[in-house]
């Protein structure tokens, strides 16, 4: 790790031109081994069949030795094909799977270097304090609280995918100037495309860049989304500028952007220049806000429904002409905020209208004034959460708690710890809900499922098990969230979690959405 840190501290321009040699460094594969195969807080662990960690480290050294050989990648793909069609061999399968997994994970770590350096330098240049808080998912809801109450319409956008793999490589060309590294990426993507088109006839057959190689594909997808968001901001700024200038001046500005090669505006301007001055003049809206997480985005505006429809069809043309992606109209829904609840980041969000009457006294005359205030409201999607719990075998589809038979081989402390961790994570994530009744129901399901699992392990009933050990066994870890909140708020504050249903708390340390919450 120290060697990688020393490399990162070098000149940024050199790193962009010399990323390829990192593929031959042992510490890169060791880092990929720790993050990819042993699991981390961001990625699920991948099982290495029949080998422990020490054996895996030995295989890492063997991989580095083999990668120096000529035509190693081609032979790796051929081995994968032979395992699929000629006959299954456990050893050949393992080495092929392990090597492809390690190379892809290491490739993902290396390709993230220029972006991570640019991100850190940006925050240091802007002197943004506590910029880590901006990574929190809950920070999005604080933004929505401030902005959505003043807007009229919202568009739910499902970003189209996939796009052509060659476009992904072209997107990275403006950030990475290492030509051999880009050629290697192109080789991997084309091999993945060819192998992915074949039928899988064996249960354990895993090929290069299968779905287990999530880190690289997430990076490529984020690069694609960043590209279209960058151009969307460009269009947005031009639409605001258009009414202040003539079409001729605007075309002059597009020629200026056409000269900026590293921003990849050239092709975009050539395609869109013909209709920019005809379409963007009616897209001006100074009150427009955009929020995205993963493949879903929200575009809110204070404009009219006609304006939102124009933006909708503009997005379709933009995706089609620039990214060569044909998308369907159902991927963008336009709704009025006053009577619409949208699902985003594990919450059901809506605008609550509060009607009130104010008596106004002027001299001897008095009259009533009806006022309407809007408030951003978030609630727990109970039905979605019950569906996730049912899929994870904690309850039935109707919400009836059941035992988890797979966990009965664990110790009692491990079972309690697993259920308690799930419950605390859900309570922590949904602390911003204005109504806690639904969250109490979810906690009740997990609590009773834990009791049924323990009773099944000891071949007893839930009532007998709780009578013998006491109900405090389950109370001990389920109330940890409430104990923490009682320390934050003084006793004089009328905040009691079980009594109040309107208090909301947003945390700035949540950087990953829980799998039970993510229904997309």
From Swiss-Prot:
Protein name stated in the entry: Maturase K
GO molecular function, one term: RNA binding
Family: Belongs to the intron maturase 2 family. MatK subfamily.
GO-annotated cellular components: chloroplast
KW Metal-binding (keyword) present: no
InterPro entries per the UniProt record, alphabetical: Domain_X, Maturase_MatK, Maturase_MatK_N
Function: Usually encoded in the trnK tRNA gene intron. Probably assists in splicing its own and other chloroplast group II introns.
Pfam families in UniProt: Intron_maturas2, MatK_N
Location of this chain's protein in the cell: Plastid, Chloroplast
A biological process term (GO) from this entry: mRNA processing
Keywords from the named record: Chloroplast, mRNA processing, Plastid, RNA-binding, tRNA processing
Main location group: plastid
């Amino acid at each position: 790790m120290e060697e990688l840190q020393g490399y990162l501290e070098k000149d940024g321009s050199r790193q962009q031109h010399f990323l390829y040699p990192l593929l031959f460094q042992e510490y890169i594969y060791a880092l990929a081994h720790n993050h990819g195969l042993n699991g981390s807080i961001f990625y699920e662990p991948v099982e290495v069949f029949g080998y422990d960690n020490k054996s895996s480290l030995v295989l890492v050294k063997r991989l580095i030795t083999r990668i120096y050989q000529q035509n190693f990648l081609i032979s790796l793909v051929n081995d994968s094909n032979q395992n699929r069609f000629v006959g299954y061999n456990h050893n050949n399968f393992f080495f092929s799977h392990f090597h492809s997994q390690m190379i892809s994970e290491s490739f993902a770590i290396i390709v993230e270097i220029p972006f991570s350096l640019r991100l850190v330098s940006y925050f240091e240049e802007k002197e943004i304090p506590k910029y880590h808080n901006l990574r929190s998912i809950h920070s999005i809801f604080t933004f929505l609280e401030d902005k959505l109450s003043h807007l009229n319409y919202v568009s739910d956008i499902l970003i189209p995918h996939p796009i052509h793999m060659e476009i992904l490589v072209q997107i990275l060309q403006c950030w990475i100037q290492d030509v051999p590294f880009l050629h290697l990426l192109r080789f991997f993507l084309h091999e993945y495309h060819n192998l992915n088109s074949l039928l899988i006839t064996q249960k354990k057959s895993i090929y290069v860049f299968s779905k287990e190689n999530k880190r690289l594909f997430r990076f490529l997808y984020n690069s694609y989304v960043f590209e279209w968001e960058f151009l969307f901001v460009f269009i947005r700024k031009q639409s605001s500028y258009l009414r202040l200038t003539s079409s001729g001046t605007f075309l002059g500005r597009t020629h200026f952007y056409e000269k900026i090669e590293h921003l990849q505006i050239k092709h975009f301007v050539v395609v869109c220049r013909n209709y920019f001055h005809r379409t963007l003049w009616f897209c001006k809206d100074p009150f427009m806000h955009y929020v995205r997480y993963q493949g879903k985005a929200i575009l809110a505006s204070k404009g009219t429904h006609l304006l939102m429809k124009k933006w909708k069809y503009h997005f379709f043309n933009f995706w089609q002409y620039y990214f060569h992606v044909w998308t369907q109209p159902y991927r963008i829904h336009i709704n009025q905020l006053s009577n619409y609840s949208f699902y985003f980041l594990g919450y059901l969000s809506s605008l609550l209208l509060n009607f009130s009457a104010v008596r106004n006294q002027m001299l001897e005359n008095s009259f009533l004034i009806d006022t309407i205030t809007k408030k951003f409201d978030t609630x727990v999607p109970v039905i979605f959460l019950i569906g996730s719990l049912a899929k994870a075998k904690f309850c039935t589809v109707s919400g009836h708690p059941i035992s988890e038979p797979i966990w009965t081989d664990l110790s009692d402390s491990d079972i309690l710890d697993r259920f308690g961790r799930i419950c605390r994570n859900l309570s922590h994530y949904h602390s911003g809900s204005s109504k806690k009744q639904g969250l109490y129901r979810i906690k009740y399901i997990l609590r009773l499922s834990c009791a049924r699992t323990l009773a099944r392990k000891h071949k007893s009933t839930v009532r007998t098990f709780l009578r013998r050990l006491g109900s405090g066994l389950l109370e001990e870890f389920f109330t940890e969230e409430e104990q923490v909140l009682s320390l934050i708020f003084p006793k004089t504050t009328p905040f009691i979690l079980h009594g109040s249903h309107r208090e909301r708390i947003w945390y700035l340390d949540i950087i990953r959405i829980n799998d039970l919450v993510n229904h997309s």
